[in-house]
Amino acid sequence: MSDPGFLAAPVLLLLLVSLASASLEQAASRDDDSAERPLSKRHSEGTFTSDYSKYLENKQAKDFVRWLMNAKRGGSELQRRHADGTFTNDMTSYLDAKAARDFVSWLARSDKSRRDGGDHLAENSEDKRHAEDVNALLDRTMAKTFIEWLEKQNSNDQTD
């Protein structure tokens, strides 16, 4: 045992083992630190997001209350608008019904004058051609008016 190499080998081995364990501990502690950093970072980001969400909710609630208060102060304007719209709708319905009645009465008069011999006004062939042209023009105009009225009724029915 007096051999220095015999003692140096175990001491060297012990030194290597302690260095290895120390470096492993340092690596493990670095891993723990790096694992804690993202958690704390995520926690702080989550806290910020939560606080910001609460702020936005409060702001929206205040804006809504402000809107309600303004609507309550100017409520007569909203009622007036509704009344104006109701009047306009009623007037449109009345005018549409009147146009339909006028058109039906025009058709009835036109049919009656044809049956009664409405051609007695046009004595010669030139007058007859002119009357036919006028009648054709009136028929086209009334047909166009009737189609527009029907389309308007259809669009009103679709919006309601």
Curated annotation (Swiss-Prot):
GO terms for cellular component: extracellular region. Pfam families: Hormone_2 (PF00123). Residues 23-40, 74-79, 116-127 form a propeptide. The gene is gcg1. This is Glucagon-1. One of its GO terms (molecular function) is hormone activity. Residues 1-22 form the signal peptide. Residues 112-132 are annotated as: Disordered. It is found in: Secreted.
